[in-house]
């Protein structure tokens, strides 16, 4: 967080080379912009990315607080906002690459804004390998570096949506399964995960057919979750307005 030209901005520094920063961030990338001292006598010039500062908390922090307070109304608002964001992501020809609640800011104005696009996929990167695999707590367990296309956000989008819908129905799930590393579920053992099983039972009991079908996709053997976009569209149908935030 810095002040520049009378405005509060964000400044991200890169201590090691990163692929495709120019393609991802465009003119926001300032190459060899900052000199960092590594010792009293030596230092290194590093690349930086200048962006808009977004006042707010991460989605993970906001969800944890709302669940602890049993604030179902706030959780219901968050899940509606997230489903619209998820639909936009999974129908785009780009992908975030490391979609997780810690990389989404809930702005003070009530918008959801993704941050940290370093692992993004753009159409120009077709055929390349992924520079990183994202955070394991939200990624399909079968994801490898070879999986690098516009669909790599499918699994984390479905997982986060499922967890938010479950918490909006029963915030006490956070007491039993909430985690600083994830939300409720462990992808590596999703089929036997007690939180996942409890979620399916909850959705079935409440007649939440769309959410039940999205949750079922989390056991798919592939990263591409066929039908996810249509299910998310059905979930947000009739919802008015947009969860807008500054473009990347």
Residue ranges and their predicted role:
Residues 26-74:
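Conserved structural core of kinase catalytic domains
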Residues 73-85:
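Conserved alphaE helix
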Residues 103-115:
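Conserved protein kinase catalytic/activation segment
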Residues 166-247:
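Helical subdomain adjoining the active site within ATP-dependent kinase catalytic cores
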């Amino acid at each position: 967080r810095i002040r520049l030209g009378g405005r509060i901005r964000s400044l991200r520094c890169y201590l090691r080379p990163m692929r495709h920063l120019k393609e991802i961030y465009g003119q926001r990338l300032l190459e060899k912009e900052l000199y960092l001292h590594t010792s009293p006598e030596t230092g290194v010039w590093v690349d930086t990315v200048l962006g808009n500062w977004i006042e707010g908390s991460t989605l993970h922090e906001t969800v944890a607080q709302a669940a602890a307070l049993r604030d179902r109304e706030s959780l219901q608002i968050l899940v509606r906002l997230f489903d619209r964001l998820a639909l936009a992501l999974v129908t785009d020809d780009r992908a975030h690459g490391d979609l997780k609640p810690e990389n989404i800011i809930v702005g003070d104005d009530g918008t959801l804004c993704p941050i940290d696009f370093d692992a993004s996929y753009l159409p120009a990167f077709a055929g390349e390998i992924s520079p990183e695999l994202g955070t394991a707590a939200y990624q399909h367990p079968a994801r490898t570096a070879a999986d690098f296309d516009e669909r790599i956000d499918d699994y984390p989008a479905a997982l986060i949506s499922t967890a938010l819908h479950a918490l909006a129905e029963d915030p006490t799930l956070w007491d039993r399964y909430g985690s600083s590393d994830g939300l409720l579920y462990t992808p590596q053992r999703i089929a036997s995960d007690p939180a996942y099983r409890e979620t399916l039972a909850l959705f079935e009991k409440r007649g939440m057919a769309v959410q039940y079908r999205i949750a079922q996709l989390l056991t798919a053997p592939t990263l591409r979750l066929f039908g996810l976009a249509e299910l998310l569209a059905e979930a947000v149908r009739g919802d008015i307005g947009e969860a807008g935030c500054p473009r990347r």
